[in-house]
Amino acid sequence: MLVCGKGFLKCRAPGVPFFCDKRKSFFTKTKRGFHSLPLGTGVRVYFNNNLRYSSNSIEVVEKAAINMGSKEDKADNPALSSYDDAMEALSTLISRRNRGDRTPTKGNRDKLEQVVTYLKILDLEDKIKELKVIHVAGTKGKGSTCVFSEAILRNCGFRTGMFTSPHLIDVRERFRIDGLDISEEKFLQYFWECWKLLKEKAVDGLTMPPLFQFLTVLAFKIFVCEKVDVAVIEVGLGGKLDSTNVIQKPVVCGIASLGMDHMDILGNTLADIAFHKAGIFKPQIPAFTVPQLSEAMDVLQKTANNLEVPLEVVAPLEPKKLDGVTLGLSGDHQLVNAGLAVSLSRCWLQRTGNWKKIFPNESKETEIPVAFCRGLATARLHGRAQVVHDVVSDPQDSSDSMETPCGDLIFYLDGAHSPESMEACGRWFSSAVRGDKSLSTAVNGYMRHGEYGTDLNRVSKQILLFNCMEVRDPQVLLPKLVTTCASSGTHFSRALFVPSMSTYNKVISGASAIPSDTRRKDLTWQFRLQRLWEKSIQGTDAGLDHTLKPDGITALPPHDFLCGDAPQCGGPAGTPVTSSAVMPSLPLTINWLRDCVRRNPSLKLEVLVTGSLHLVGDVLRLLKR
């Protein structure tokens, strides 16, 4: 447990819980007690179990850091100023086209040829051939698969590099070395080296690369210079024409679960999407995938046959094989991703000649080595099935007493934005909120706790905080979430729809100032989401106020708005009661939720944040402040 107070970070039983099932302990026990680390040293502390695990031992090292403060407070810091300059430079590479205006990728290989040209300019074309790459594509679960694979191989003693997308708070999240985001110093070193060389060559018709292409070549630059043993590369979008597909001879390829997403670019059928994903297959290079619908599987198998690729379908990991260890990423669906990661990691070790060196006594393919279990248990990925207990205090209390988590406001964050991932999100959230309520009884969407402490009537309410991009289909996403949760006995008391805080035409850092949201925003999209929600819940939107103008909301709902009961899907007909609200801004919404639990200490709010990774990242930024 990490508690911040009086200028020190106090670590209670530092590290992670012990894995003692079946008398096996994966972590060296440490003496319980408080240990203090001075704050204000420029190091960053993430309070959400973002831990570093040494590649050479089982030692667990807390990833230290604190909020760097506002941009203004650090204006005279050369390192931070240079980092802001880098963010400004990156922002100039963002395409101004809307996603719906993108040209379909079929048959167009100009983009890959450009990436190869940029690699030549940076003298990386031949050097990246020496990288031992695991290349992963997919619709749902490719990021988790990469994280599991990286953690497994790091715990086997290898120096790891991992490139994933998108980032939630800071662009450095996309580049991990040995399980940690690359440092600002190294990021700036490699960034400016690439930037200056490419800028010098941006003549005679060769332009600077778009943002993702630049980040891709930057990742290769980092991994080559850092001399990683393994580079785990996540496809950005699709596969066949993705910027990462300049990798000609990966060690092994993986395809995570496929579904309907990015249809404006990849096509409107599952077969079209599978065609693009299978584009990362290389002749005679082993590939693994998970169980797929037949329409997708047929395309994957046909592509594999044409390229003489040995393609293996991997079953979800059986929990009993973990010997009592819990996966580091929550949700039953992660067993699918973990199974794929185990196969990818095992194949990588075998093809690089390391398997027998590290595991000379492991003869059975079905057994999972202890180092693999350790990696699976310690994998971390922000914004996917992540739980954050907010620290709520009285702003009028000026005493020096330490802030303590009151347990009244808990955020459940998952960046689900496709029908398949929304269903998985609903199952995870329902399971998570039931986890500590086994002694309680559900009453119309909330839980009454009478077994502990002096609060005999503690009320838990499930709240939805939602936004999605306009290219998504909320008519599919919202009903999928509602029905999945309802089937598990979880009903949302209220739903809150918020506008985006992210600036899509600018790359920001974790230390960037948060927008003040003083300007009124166009909330037309949020009102549409609200109408779809009310129809999903009550079959009508008659309870909504249609006189409100989309740009006219400045007020927040009364605090007792959250005290109502959860409406039941398909309930008896009658006068509908509005179970949702459109909020003017995200920062105001977070403060309003905090005010609600301050005013009612017996209220426990369990807030599911989903629909967009951008929304999840924005909430995490606000919770860090």
Curated annotation (Swiss-Prot):
One of its GO terms (cellular component) is mitochondrial inner membrane. One of its GO terms (biological process) is seedling development. The keyword Ligase applies. Its EC number is 6.3.2.17. It catalyses: (6S)-5,6,7,8-tetrahydrofolyl-(gamma-L-Glu)(n) + L-glutamate + ATP = (6S)-5,6,7,8-tetrahydrofolyl-(gamma-L-Glu)(n+1) + ADP + phosphate + H(+). A monovalent cation. The keyword Membrane applies. Keywords: ATP-binding, Ligase, Magnesium, Membrane, Metal-binding, Mitochondrion, Mitochondrion inner membrane, Nucleotide-binding, One-carbon metabolism. It is found in: Mitochondrion inner membrane; Mitochondrion matrix. Mg(2+) 1 binds at S165, E234. Pathway: Cofactor biosynthesis; tetrahydrofolylpolyglutamate biosynthesis. Mg(2+) 2 binds at H262. One of its GO terms (molecular function) is ATP binding. Disruption phenotype: Vegetative phenotype does not differ visually from wild-type. No obvious defects in root development. Polyglutamylated folates still detectable, but loss of activity leads to a significant reduction (45%) in total foliar folate abundance compared to wild-type. The reduced total folate content is a result of reduced levels of 5-formyl-THF, 10-formyl and 5,10-methenyl-THF, 5-methyl-THF and THF (42, 42, 53 and 48%, respectively) compared to wild-type. The plastid and mitochondrial folate levels are also reduced by approximately 50 and 55%, respectively compared to wild-type. Its cofactor is a monovalent cation. ATP binds at G141, K142, G143, S144, R384, D414. InterPro entries: Folylpolyglutamate_synth, Folylpolyglutamate_synth_CS, Mur-like_cat_sf, Mur_ligase_C_dom_sf. It comes from the Eukaryota. PROSITE patterns: FOLYLPOLYGLU_SYNT_2. Belongs to the folylpolyglutamate synthase family. Catalyzes conversion of folates to polyglutamate derivatives allowing concentration of folate compounds in the cell and the intracellular retention of these cofactors, which are important substrates for most of the folate-dependent enzymes that are involved in one-carbon transfer reactions involved in purine, pyrimidine and amino acid synthesis. Essential for organellar and whole-plant folate homeostasis. This is Folylpolyglutamate synthase. It comes from Arabidopsis thaliana.
